[in-house]
From Swiss-Prot:
It comes from the Eukaryota. Glycans are attached at residues 41, 59, 107, 228, 277, 337, 344, 351, 403, 500, 509, 554, 567, 588, 627, 683, 719. GO terms for cellular component: extracellular region. Beta-glucosidases are one of a number of cellulolytic enzymes involved in the degradation of cellulosic biomass. Catalyzes the last step releasing glucose from the inhibitory cellobiose. GO terms for molecular function: beta-glucosidase activity. The active site is at residue 305. It catalyses: Hydrolysis of terminal, non-reducing beta-D-glucosyl residues with release of beta-D-glucose. Its main location: secreted. This is Probable beta-glucosidase G.
Amino acid sequence: MTSASQILVWGLLAASGAQAQNYGGGSSRSDDAFSYVQPKNTTILGAYGHSPAVYPSPNTTGSGGWETALAQAQDFVAQLTLEEKANMVTGQPGPCVGNIIAIPRLNFSGLCLQDGPLAIRVTDMASVFSAGVTAAASWDRKILYERGYAMGQEFKAKGAHVALGPVAGPLGRSAYSGRNWEGFAADPYLTGVAMEETIQGYQDAGVQACPKHFIGNEQETMRNPTFNDSAPLGTVIQEAVSSNIDDRTMHELYLWPFANAVHAKAASIMCSYQRINGSYGCENSKTLNGLLKGELGFQGYVMSDWGATHSGVAGIKSGQDMDMPGGLGAYGQTFINRSFFGGNVTAAVNNGTLEESRIDDMILRIMTPYFWLGQDQDYPTVDPSTADYNTFSPRNTWYQDFNLTGERSRDVRGNHAALIRKQAAEATVLLKNKNNALPLKAPKTLAVFGNDASDITNGPYNDATYEYGTLAAGGGSGTGRFTYLVSPLTAINARAQKDNTSLVQFWLNNTQIATSDVQADLLRVPTPPTACLVFVKTWAEEGADREHLRLDYNGTEVVEAVAAACNNTIVVTHSSGINELPFANHPNVTAILAAHFPGQESGNSIVDVLYGDVNPSGRLPYTIARNGSDYNAPPTTAVTTSGREDWQSWFDEKLEIDYRYFDAHNIPVLYEFGFGLSYTTFNISDIYATRVVDSITSAPEDRAIQPGGNPELWETIYNVTVSVTNTGDVEGATVPQLYVTFPDSTPEGTPPKQLRGFDKVSLQPGESTKVIFELMRRDLSYWDTVSQQWLIPEGDFTIRVGFSSRNLKEVTTITPVSE
């Protein structure tokens, strides 16, 4: 048993380790960085600038299939002392990134919480998978599930009970957000599907999923408050940025994918650093009690992001259930040896400030998914190597003995290398392929350019950008520790040997390439190589928003210098997401591939695509504009005033993000949302829609809330069928996409079209197949702010199906509710 006074000690130690990781946000920016200064006279919050109070925090009922596990959790809670209850909701320093200590007398071994969304970050002998944005670019439900399941297997085998992912916040409001790559797509529907498939994969493997960051977490700059460190507790100078989001936008954009997460029975959800409509994410009763636990019927527990707890009693009453990592404070503040939770929970119950029943519900929410997933039955112990790599809470900060007696450095990778290679290849997006430059056909000579082509030079773990070495993951808590990383140059050399390619030249110094006459100074041969491969990259990380949308390390200049000398220049980008591509129409740039962050099999996966072993079938999960200045919804990077509440981010674009914005304003783009080429061709035909229910009303029947909300919203009401044919000469996969245009009766501000269905189909030459899209009630509904419910508008819906958001071949109409 740990006393209240003991609980107060370790908060300092855990939090100090967190501060050292420098994930705080609001870091300094270079002189030429993109800047958006908040306009003056916006510091007085508007109609949606104040988050309304919603109390009390709803109790869990175990609905959705957790009833038996809830009964087990109730029996467990009934045996706890008050001090043990405080420990159950408060993190401590230990071997994992987050730790809930064991209670041996109840045979509870504690909880190990581990980063992150593409790998187990603090361990060895584990795989590094492709990033979320890469997985989303596959537009493949099977890949999304398999990736989640394989990661879940590795987390479990290392003894982690909770995987801190996947990510739906940021959604991708801004092209500049530093963490877009951790998430999936700049669209709520595609992100929602990716969340659901990934969570089901994690949890089918026996690991709790923790979707994050709830909600409106769309920028890194000023995500935490600034403090006067000289004050006893660190007086706040300026509060964290507030994401100010209107009710309809909240529901139709930012809450949408979290509804999928809850529908998938996610065990936990992480609340975010920043404020939402004036209140911090982890003490916002409207978002936690009202939206998440109330409207969506979430049955699991809400944990704080690391250092995102700003209060004890207020946060608990507002719906927060677990404090991580357990110490008092937030990033940038001098931590002291107390916890907002911990001993303060005990004190608050004893003095009547908190009802013990609320603490009981917090623990029921924590333990119900634990029992539901069978984590009380022969669960693997924590790998001791985890502690060796965990700089978040080094061993000398631990207050408890974690009895790490299991096998050290256990290899949990299994056969996942082949899976990672396949997934990354199939997610690669072919943006340009002039004159069928790809696939390569045993070229006689090759030249490889760019610092992204080579082996990494800074070791297996990189939390900051690096000049030399291929980029396979971003930085921050969402990164991974490579046991190996196959570079493009290594894989190309291996393939060249196999093909008897006579010469593979390479230049890795971007400055040298960009400032040279490539033909005269570098190639020094009378005729250019058969193909020139240029590898360029763009870093992004937690804690800082992107400063520009250009390629890093003079990448554009490198491409242009090579293209000036080589009439078959093939460009591969390893990027966190959106890039400006001013060379896209250069006549000598014959092919462009967006490979995003592919994980440890980077080189092998791109060579599979370059040589045609895999026909690329990735599609863009965002829009690539003609110019960086064409994007809307910038992050707030600075303010001109010094008031405590002055950091505001006004989501006044409302529903118009990414393709919705470009479509609404008829802005030409370079490559549209959903775009991607193949080495073969496809056709779509014969669209028809079928109503599958007899009667459809505008409002859903008022039914008991289940995980995901009103179950009526998840019922299919229409099927839309099309025929897809491979009209080319080689096998390939394509992604038919369905977009809905709402009737004119829908309120103003509705986007011209919205993604509401997709499927990936693989076909042999000449083969055809039927694709059926199931449209649920929620897919045809908008959020009505007056009645506070989802409504299907009266009138005709236009249904379009095609191969991208701007290549829609087949059209039909449906009328669910007549005028």
